[in-house]
Amino acid sequence: SLEQKYNAVCFDIDGTLTKKNSKEIDERVIKMIADLLKQKIPIVFITGRGSTGLNHLLNDIQFKLLNLYNVNNNELKRIYALANDGARLFYTSNDKIFNECIYTITDDKLYELKKFDEEIIKMKNKKIDDICKIAYSKDAVNNKILNVRFVLQDDKDDNVKIVMDFIKNVINDYNLNGLSITRGKYKESSVIQVGTTSKDIAIETAERLVGVPKNSMMRIGDCGDKIGNDYAMLN
Protein backbone atom coordinates (compact mmCIF):
# COMPACT_ATOMS: atom_id res chain seq x y z
CA SER A 1 0.00 0.00 0.00
CA LEU A 2 1.14 3.52 -0.72
CA GLU A 3 0.47 4.50 2.89
CA GLN A 4 2.72 1.78 4.34
CA LYS A 5 5.96 2.87 5.97
CA TYR A 6 9.00 0.91 4.79
CA ASN A 7 12.14 0.43 6.88
CA ALA A 8 14.50 -0.81 4.13
CA VAL A 9 14.61 -0.78 0.34
CA CYS A 10 15.58 -3.62 -2.02
CA PHE A 11 16.42 -2.65 -5.60
CA ASP A 12 16.93 -4.64 -8.74
CA ILE A 13 19.55 -2.86 -10.90
CA ASP A 14 19.22 -3.53 -14.63
CA GLY A 15 16.03 -2.16 -16.15
CA THR A 16 15.08 -0.60 -12.82
CA LEU A 17 17.87 1.84 -11.88
CA THR A 18 19.58 2.04 -15.27
CA LYS A 19 19.01 4.43 -18.15
CA LYS A 20 16.91 3.06 -21.00
CA ASN A 21 18.81 0.48 -23.07
CA SER A 22 21.92 1.09 -20.99
CA LYS A 23 23.87 -0.40 -18.07
CA GLU A 24 24.56 3.10 -16.69
CA ILE A 25 22.78 4.14 -13.50
CA ASP A 26 20.35 7.04 -13.89
CA GLU A 27 21.63 10.21 -12.20
CA ARG A 28 18.28 10.70 -10.43
CA VAL A 29 18.69 7.31 -8.78
CA ILE A 30 22.02 8.30 -7.22
CA LYS A 31 20.40 11.26 -5.47
CA MET A 32 17.58 9.01 -4.26
CA ILE A 33 20.11 6.51 -2.85
CA ALA A 34 21.91 9.35 -1.05
CA ASP A 35 18.64 10.62 0.42
CA LEU A 36 17.74 7.14 1.71
CA LEU A 37 21.17 6.70 3.31
CA LYS A 38 20.90 10.10 5.00
CA GLN A 39 17.59 8.94 6.48
CA LYS A 40 19.33 5.81 7.87
CA ILE A 41 17.42 3.50 5.50
CA PRO A 42 19.36 0.31 4.59
CA ILE A 43 19.62 -0.38 0.86
CA VAL A 44 20.01 -3.88 -0.58
CA PHE A 45 20.73 -4.37 -4.27
CA ILE A 46 19.40 -7.79 -5.34
CA THR A 47 20.76 -8.44 -8.80
CA GLY A 48 21.68 -11.05 -11.34
CA ARG A 49 24.93 -9.15 -11.87
CA GLY A 50 28.17 -10.69 -10.68
CA SER A 51 31.24 -8.91 -9.32
CA THR A 52 32.09 -7.30 -12.68
CA GLY A 53 28.59 -5.87 -12.95
CA LEU A 54 28.80 -4.59 -9.37
CA ASN A 55 32.06 -2.83 -10.23
CA HIS A 56 30.24 -1.04 -13.04
CA LEU A 57 27.60 0.02 -10.51
CA LEU A 58 30.30 1.37 -8.19
CA ASN A 59 31.89 3.33 -11.02
CA ASP A 60 28.54 5.02 -11.56
CA ILE A 61 27.60 5.83 -7.97
CA GLN A 62 30.49 5.83 -5.51
CA PHE A 63 32.29 9.07 -6.43
CA LYS A 64 29.03 11.00 -6.65
CA LEU A 65 27.69 9.66 -3.36
CA LEU A 66 30.87 10.67 -1.55
CA ASN A 67 31.68 13.94 -3.28
CA LEU A 68 28.46 15.33 -4.73
CA TYR A 69 25.98 14.22 -2.07
CA ASN A 70 28.37 14.12 0.91
CA VAL A 71 27.52 10.59 2.00
CA ASN A 72 29.98 9.59 4.73
CA ASN A 73 31.67 6.24 5.35
CA ASN A 74 29.25 5.18 8.09
CA GLU A 75 26.32 5.85 5.78
CA LEU A 76 27.98 3.78 3.03
CA LYS A 77 27.86 0.77 5.37
CA ARG A 78 24.07 0.71 4.98
CA ILE A 79 24.51 -0.46 1.37
CA TYR A 80 24.54 -4.21 0.66
CA ALA A 81 24.44 -6.23 -2.55
CA LEU A 82 23.18 -9.77 -3.10
CA ALA A 83 24.83 -10.68 -6.41
CA ASN A 84 24.07 -13.57 -8.77
CA ASP A 85 20.45 -13.40 -7.57
CA GLY A 86 21.59 -13.87 -3.98
CA ALA A 87 24.44 -16.39 -4.21
CA ARG A 88 26.97 -13.91 -2.81
CA LEU A 89 26.67 -11.08 -0.31
CA PHE A 90 28.84 -8.00 -0.79
CA TYR A 91 29.01 -5.52 2.07
CA THR A 92 31.07 -2.54 3.22
CA SER A 93 33.49 -2.43 6.14
CA ASN A 94 35.51 0.67 5.28
CA ASP A 95 35.35 3.55 2.80
CA LYS A 96 35.20 1.27 -0.26
CA ILE A 97 31.74 -0.07 -1.05
CA PHE A 98 31.44 -3.87 -1.25
CA ASN A 99 35.01 -4.55 -0.13
CA GLU A 100 33.83 -7.73 1.66
CA CYS A 101 32.18 -10.78 0.10
CA ILE A 102 30.74 -14.03 1.49
CA TYR A 103 28.79 -16.89 -0.07
CA THR A 104 25.20 -17.34 1.07
CA ILE A 105 24.75 -20.73 -0.60
CA THR A 106 26.09 -24.19 0.21
CA ASP A 107 28.91 -26.07 -1.49
CA ASP A 108 26.34 -28.72 -2.42
CA LYS A 109 24.47 -26.24 -4.60
CA LEU A 110 27.68 -25.08 -6.27
CA TYR A 111 28.51 -28.73 -6.97
CA GLU A 112 25.07 -29.27 -8.53
CA LEU A 113 25.61 -26.32 -10.87
CA LYS A 114 29.07 -27.62 -11.83
CA LYS A 115 27.53 -31.05 -12.50
CA PHE A 116 24.80 -29.44 -14.63
CA ASP A 117 27.44 -27.65 -16.71
CA GLU A 118 29.50 -30.81 -17.16
CA GLU A 119 26.48 -32.76 -18.41
CA ILE A 120 25.31 -30.15 -20.93
CA ILE A 121 28.87 -29.97 -22.32
CA LYS A 122 28.93 -33.76 -22.72
CA MET A 123 25.59 -33.76 -24.53
CA LYS A 124 26.65 -31.33 -27.29
CA ASN A 125 23.01 -30.76 -28.23
CA LYS A 126 23.05 -29.27 -31.74
CA LYS A 127 19.47 -28.03 -31.54
CA ILE A 128 20.31 -26.03 -28.42
CA ASP A 129 23.52 -24.72 -30.00
CA ASP A 130 21.55 -23.50 -33.02
CA ILE A 131 19.09 -21.36 -31.06
CA CYS A 132 21.15 -20.02 -28.16
CA LYS A 133 24.60 -19.36 -26.80
CA ILE A 134 25.72 -20.41 -23.34
CA ALA A 135 27.35 -17.78 -21.12
CA TYR A 136 28.62 -17.96 -17.55
CA SER A 137 28.94 -15.85 -14.45
CA LYS A 138 31.95 -17.04 -12.44
CA ASP A 139 33.72 -16.02 -9.26
CA ALA A 140 36.81 -14.13 -10.44
CA VAL A 141 38.79 -15.41 -7.44
CA ASN A 142 38.15 -19.16 -7.53
CA ASN A 143 36.50 -19.58 -10.97
CA LYS A 144 33.43 -21.30 -9.49
CA ILE A 145 30.37 -21.17 -11.74
CA LEU A 146 27.57 -19.08 -10.23
CA ASN A 147 25.13 -18.95 -13.15
CA VAL A 148 24.73 -20.72 -16.50
CA ARG A 149 22.88 -18.54 -18.99
CA PHE A 150 21.18 -19.74 -22.16
CA VAL A 151 21.09 -16.59 -24.29
CA LEU A 152 18.42 -17.00 -26.96
CA GLN A 153 18.79 -15.58 -30.46
CA ASP A 154 15.07 -14.73 -30.54
CA ASP A 155 11.93 -14.82 -28.37
CA LYS A 156 10.00 -17.45 -30.33
CA ASP A 157 7.85 -19.51 -27.97
CA ASP A 158 8.92 -22.77 -29.61
CA ASN A 159 12.60 -22.03 -29.02
CA VAL A 160 12.00 -20.95 -25.43
CA LYS A 161 10.16 -24.24 -24.82
CA ILE A 162 12.97 -26.29 -26.39
CA VAL A 163 15.57 -24.71 -24.13
CA MET A 164 13.37 -24.85 -21.04
CA ASP A 165 12.55 -28.54 -21.60
CA PHE A 166 16.22 -29.33 -22.17
CA ILE A 167 17.23 -27.65 -18.89
CA LYS A 168 14.45 -29.32 -16.90
CA ASN A 169 15.32 -32.75 -18.31
CA VAL A 170 18.98 -32.41 -17.31
CA ILE A 171 17.99 -31.28 -13.81
CA ASN A 172 15.53 -34.16 -13.42
CA ASP A 173 17.80 -36.83 -14.94
CA TYR A 174 20.65 -36.02 -12.55
CA ASN A 175 18.55 -35.04 -9.50
CA LEU A 176 19.92 -31.50 -9.42
CA ASN A 177 16.91 -30.28 -7.51
CA GLY A 178 18.74 -27.51 -5.65
CA LEU A 179 19.05 -25.47 -8.84
CA SER A 180 16.78 -22.58 -9.83
CA ILE A 181 15.55 -21.57 -13.30
CA THR A 182 14.62 -17.97 -14.09
CA ARG A 183 14.02 -15.88 -17.19
CA GLY A 184 15.24 -12.38 -17.80
CA LYS A 185 17.54 -10.24 -19.94
CA TYR A 186 21.29 -10.45 -20.48
CA LYS A 187 23.00 -7.85 -22.67
CA GLU A 188 19.61 -6.99 -24.21
CA SER A 189 18.86 -10.62 -25.19
CA SER A 190 16.29 -12.96 -23.67
CA VAL A 191 17.92 -15.46 -21.37
CA ILE A 192 17.01 -18.54 -19.39
CA GLN A 193 19.29 -18.73 -16.38
CA VAL A 194 20.21 -21.70 -14.21
CA GLY A 195 21.64 -20.84 -10.82
CA THR A 196 21.88 -21.83 -7.19
CA THR A 197 19.25 -19.45 -5.83
CA SER A 198 16.62 -16.91 -6.85
CA LYS A 199 15.49 -13.45 -5.82
CA ASP A 200 12.65 -14.67 -3.58
CA ILE A 201 15.24 -16.56 -1.53
CA ALA A 202 17.56 -13.54 -1.68
CA ILE A 203 14.82 -11.38 -0.17
CA GLU A 204 14.70 -13.74 2.83
CA THR A 205 18.48 -13.32 3.12
CA ALA A 206 18.04 -9.55 3.03
CA GLU A 207 15.41 -9.84 5.74
CA ARG A 208 17.91 -11.51 8.08
CA LEU A 209 20.72 -9.22 6.99
CA VAL A 210 19.13 -5.88 7.84
CA GLY A 211 16.79 -7.16 10.56
CA VAL A 212 13.68 -5.90 8.78
CA PRO A 213 10.70 -8.17 7.93
CA LYS A 214 10.31 -8.51 4.16
CA ASN A 215 6.84 -7.00 4.28
CA SER A 216 8.45 -3.87 5.73
CA MET A 217 11.00 -3.69 2.91
CA MET A 218 10.06 -1.83 -0.24
CA ARG A 219 11.02 -4.10 -3.15
CA ILE A 220 11.46 -2.55 -6.57
CA GLY A 221 12.09 -4.53 -9.77
CA ASP A 222 11.16 -4.35 -13.43
CA CYS A 223 9.48 -7.69 -14.20
CA GLY A 224 5.91 -8.77 -13.56
CA ASP A 225 6.30 -12.16 -15.23
CA LYS A 226 5.82 -14.99 -12.72
CA ILE A 227 8.78 -16.88 -14.16
CA GLY A 228 10.81 -13.71 -14.51
CA ASN A 229 13.76 -13.21 -12.21
CA ASP A 230 12.26 -10.04 -10.70
CA TYR A 231 8.74 -11.23 -9.88
CA ALA A 232 9.59 -11.55 -6.18
CA MET A 233 10.82 -7.94 -6.24
CA LEU A 234 7.26 -6.66 -6.55
CA ASN A 235 5.59 -5.83 -3.21
Predicted regions and their residues:
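Extended hydrophobic secondary-structure segments that form protein cores and membrane-embedded regions
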Residues: 80-83, 218-222
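Phosphate/oxyanion-binding active-site loops and adjacent basic polyanion-contact surfaces
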Residues: 21-25, 50-54, 194-202
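Acidic di-acidic motifs
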Residues: 12-14, 195, 221-222
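A general structural motif
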Residues: 3-6, 40, 76-78, 145, ...
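Asp-based phosphoryl-transfer active-site loop
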Residues: 2-23, 45, 81, 230
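Active-site phosphate-binding/coordination module
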Residues: 27-139
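Conserved acidic, metal-coordinating active-site core of Asp-based
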Residues: 123-218, 226-232
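A short, Lys/Arg-enriched amphipathic alpha-helix followed by its capping loop at the start of a domain
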Residues: 2-9, 28-41, 219, 233
